[in-house]
């Protein structure tokens, strides 16, 4: 089974090169969404969690970055520990874990597990970055030569010839990433990753 996830953080990391264990460098998470597909790519679980703010205030910049309103956050926010435990339960049901820009998403998420002192199985799974694996498929020219990594909005537009809304919202992004993964998988663009199936 496949778990596709996306999270929204309240800001950018201080540095993308530092490990997630440096929790001062990695931002807090405000929104986590994931979808689990069975071997036939049919959804069997669909989770969407807004996280209640802990140690920070919701600013207009955060609202814009996460595409969530302060009212929604206050109404729907859940304790971080509850969300982290629910995600790890989802991990236990999956063999493959995917995300667009996996390194960013997994580091934000893993830093939260460290902060809460909760064990998890994320790094014990086969993990795949949809952004990196779709680079040759998209063939978007880089300014420095070769191809650049596509954003999820670019990948979605190339596959489906249309945009989705609102980008940068974890819920919308994970739906888009799941649609793109299914299209690429069914189009045999990812066969080298799953040749044991």
Task: Describe each PLM feature range.
Residues 1-3:
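Extreme N-terminal starter segment of soluble prokaryotic enzymes
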Residues 7-16, 20-22:
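Short acidic, Gly/Ser-rich segments with clustered Asp/Glu that frequently serve as metal-coordination loops
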Residues 15, 26-68, 88-197:
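Metal-dependent phosphoesterase core characteristic of DEDDh/y 3'-5' exonuclease domains
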Residues 63-86:
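Metal-dependent phosphoesterase signature
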């Amino acid at each position: 089974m496949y778990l596709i996830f996306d999270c929204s953080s309240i800001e950018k990391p201080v540095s993308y090169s530092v490990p997630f264990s440096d929790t001062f460098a990695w931002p807090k998470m405000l929104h986590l969404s994931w979808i689990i597909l069975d071997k036939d790519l049919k959804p069997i679980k669909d989770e969407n969690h807004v996280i209640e703010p802990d140690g920070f205030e919701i600013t207009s910049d955060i609202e814009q970055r996460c595409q969530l309103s302060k009212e929604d956050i206050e109404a729907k926010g859940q304790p971080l520990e509850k969300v982290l435990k629910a995600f790890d339960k989802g991990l236990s049901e999956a063999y493959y874990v995917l995300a667009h820009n996996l390194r960013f998403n997994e580091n934000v998420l893993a830093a939260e597990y460290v902060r809460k002192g909760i064990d998890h199985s994320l790094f014990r799974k086969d993990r795949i970055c949809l952004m990196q694996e779709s680079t040759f498929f998209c063939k978007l020219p880089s300014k420095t030569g070769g191809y650049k990594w596509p954003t999820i909005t670019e990948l979605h537009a190339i596959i489906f010839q249309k945009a989705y809304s609102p980008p940068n919202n974890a819920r919308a992004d994970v739906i888009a990433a799941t649609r793109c993964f299914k299209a690429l998988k069914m189009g045999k663009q990812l066969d080298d990753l799953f040749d044991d199936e």
